Amino acid sequence: MTFITDLETELRQNSNEELAIPMENYMKNKFSFLGIQTENRRTILKTNWHKHKEEVQTNFRSICWELFNKKEREFHQCAIDILMKEIKKKYLP
């Protein structure tokens, strides 16, 4: 899946260790973080989503599962964003 590899590459390139440590402490060290703030994470997700729109629409469930299986919390949050938007588009009036 090229969407996941592109998203992972861009998120890892924009990681910030200085922000990751306080984020992990805030969540009581239950999750690892890349240190990407919400606004930046959403813009990265949005640009990659537009590049791979058809792939995301057809495989959103498997993409979300794969993102949830990654260690860092930012991937989990991207999966939640994808799931919410795709479910609203497909199943809600």
Report each predicted region and the residues it spans.
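Surface-facing alpha-helical segments and adjacent helix-coil boundary elements at the starts of domains
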Residues: M1-P93
